[in-house]
Amino acid sequence: MNRSKFESVFSEEINQYLDHMLVSGYKERSYYYLLRKFDRFCIEYEICQPIFTHQHAKEWIHRKENEASTTHYARVNGIKQFLIYLNRKGYQIFV
């Protein structure tokens, strides 16, 4: 799969996480789209430092209008795993 370029402050970490998941046997496609949404979210909310605050988390977990509960669950929990990954690497991340 050809990856589009991620553009947020977390772009390098997103690519490393995708590589890690591929090596672990997961399919890139299942994570790519969620991480792309997260990348856009970070740009939209002008996250310029590699820090994810409580306020950012509140905005991310807010259920979108017309978002199915299963889609909401997948979006929130898929990115939660990425945030845990960042937290373990020493980033200031609210999980």
Question: What does each of the following model-derived ranges do?
Answer:
Residues 10-12:
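Extended non-catalytic domains of envelope/secretory-pathway proteins
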Residues 14-29, 33-95:
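N-terminal core-binding DNA-recognition domain of tyrosine recombinases/integrases
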Residues 3, 7, 72-75:
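Intrinsic-disorder-associated interaction segments
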Residues 1-6, 48-52:
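Intrinsic, low-complexity N-terminal interaction/targeting segments
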